[in-house]
Amino acid sequence: MKVYVNGEILDEDKAVISVFDRGFLYGDGIFETVRSYGGVVFCLKDHLDRLYSSMKSLKIRQSLSNKEMEKAVYELLRINNLEDASIRITISRGISKQRVFNISQNEVANVVISAQSFIPRPIEFYEKGINADITHFKRNSQSLLSRFKALNYLESIIVRNEAIPKGSFETIFLNEFGYVCEGTVSNIFMVKGNKLMTPSLDCGVLPGITRKIVLELASYAALGTQEGKFKEEELKDSEEVFLTNSLIELIPVVKIDDRRIGNGRVGHLTQKIHSLYKELVKKEIKN
């Protein structure tokens, strides 16, 4: 497999960065994960807009323009002969031998892009739904990092691995005020009546690209939307619950902890929204 590193496409065993890279040493960087369908990267512009906005906010010096990044992504797909792929764009602040808190304006970002064949989740996840659990660890709604896809995923890794022995696919965070926040790698949605609800960004939620799309699609399913603050019991009392991210699209949740969601089956509105999402993907590929 070939990997893009700072303007070069290299064999993966030759794709290296410095031991003084700030992303490696301090988690000083950000990333985006995108998915391609038939060789077309879905919502790449949205992901790159978020990436470059984050770089600007975090004062990470750009080494590629938005258009150059897009070109690099497609070139990597072409060279690796990939059509349905998961792609990760990783940006670190660059190389620095200075102290951790000293950010030099001369540092240029390291850019690494990797791609591999997309491995879909088991079909039964979508047909029968998955289990999730709620961790006792809390997300900080006031954290600077809640707005960014930062490299440091240690918190999510720890709580996700605690969930595996329980048979849970995903772990859900509440924030410090006890409001539903997000999953370790997903945004969360609830359906009650004809309303689609999701935690508001001020709960400490990552502004997910798929989250944004689902909110836009809701009207086509005759659903109203509400972004707000919801307690754990409100989540568990929902008629339907589903998770979103760019790789899984939408996955229904039928049990949280030991509590069945709705009738314990995949909800028809979840299926409707997922169908609309798939239609949008097909439309973008066709265009």
What is the predicted role of each segment?
Residues 186-187, 212, 248-251:
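Glycine-centered loop/turn positions within well-structured domains
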Residues 179-201, 207:
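Glycine- and Gly-Pro-enriched alpha-helical subdomains that act as flexible
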Residues 1-172, 176-179, 216-287:
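Conserved alpha/beta cores of soluble small-molecule-handling proteins
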Residues 184, 204-222, 258:
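Catalytic-pocket segment enriched in acidic/His residues
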